[in-house]
Amino acid sequence: MSDAEQSNEPIATPRGQAALLGPVEVRALAEEFGVRPTKQLGQNFVHDANTVRRIVTTAGVTRDDVVLEVGPGLGSLTMALMDVVDRVIAVEIDPNLAARLPKTVAERAPELADRLTVVEADAMRVLPSQIPGEPTALVANLPYNVAVPVLLHLFASLPSLRTALVMVQAEVADRLAADPGSKIYGVPSVKANFFGEVRRAGAVGRNVFWPVPKVESGLVRIDRYAEPPWPMDEKHRKQVFAAIDAAFAQRRKTLRAALSGWAGSPAEAERRLLAAGIEPQTRGEMLDAAAFVRLAGGE
C-alpha cells in the first residue's frame, strides 16, 4: 500500500481522471475495512482498469448523462464512470460499502468527488423517490443472483432510463438477448424486450474479478424504445407479464393448455389466442413481446 493510501491523503491525478483500482488496491481496501465479498449479495469486485474503461466506452454515456450504478462495491466502475459523466448515482445495499465509497472517491479522485451520490438501498425495492434526479443510463456490474429482477424493476420504475449496459452471468446475458424460437428464450428474454431492444455487448473474463467467480460473465445492452410501441403503464405491464409467466410456467405445453389457468379455461385461452392472431397449438417460446402484448389486449 502506498504512503498516500496509508495516510488517507488524496492521490494526485491529472485533472478529470480518477486513480482506478487495481488488484492490490481492491484487496487492501477490503482488508482494511473488513469487507468480505458475500455469496448472498452476489459480490465479485472488478479489479482491472481496462475492463471498467471498456464497460464505460461500450455504454456510450456522455457528460450530460445521469448514470445509475447498482452494486458499486469498492468503486472500480464508479470512478471510471466519473471520469466521463458529471453525475453518478450509486445504489448499494451493503452499509459498509455504501459508507466507504465516498471516502475512496475523495482519496483517489478528489476533483471528481462532487459527481457522486450514494444511496444505501436494495435495488430490487428502491423507489424513484429515493433516487435524486432522473437517471438516463444504467451502467452496472449487477449482483448475479438478482440481476434480472433488478434490471426489470429499474426499467419499470424509472421511465427516464433510456439505456442500460450491465454485466451479468454469461448464461443470463444469453437468455436476456435470446430470440424467439431458441432453446434459451424465456421469461427474461420477453420481459426485457417489452422495454426495449436487447443485445449482447461482449464477454468479460473471470480473471478481472476478486474473488474469481465460478461462472463466465457477459455484457448486455438494452435501449428503451424511443417511441413505445405499446402502453408502458404499470397496469398494462402487469397484464402482459402475467401472460408471459403463464405461457412459460409450463413451457412444453401448447399455449392453449399453458394459458388455461390464466384465461380461466382452455376454451377461453383459445379464444384469446385466436383474437390475437396466434395459433393455439403454438408454444410460448415462439412468441415475441409484441405477440404477448396483443394477447393481453393492450396493443
UniProtKB/Swiss-Prot annotation:
SUPFAM superfamilies, sorted? S-adenosyl-L-methionine-dependent methyltransferases
**What EC numbers are recorded for this enzyme?**
2.1.1.182
In which broad location class does this protein mainly occur, judging by the first location in its UniProt entry? cytoplasm
Annotated S-adenosyl-L-methionine binding sites:
44, 46, 71, 92, 122, 141
| Cellular compartments annotated | Cytoplasm
Regarding protein family, the annotation reads: Belongs to the class I-like SAM-binding methyltransferase superfamily. rRNA adenine N(6)-methyltransferase family. RsmA subfamily.
Q: Mind telling me what this protein is named?
A: Ribosomal RNA small subunit methyltransferase A
What species does this protein belong to? Rhodococcus erythropolis (strain PR4 / NBRC 100887)
Its lineage reads: Bacteria, Bacillati, Actinomycetota, Actinomycetes, Mycobacteriales
* Gene this protein is translated from: rsmA
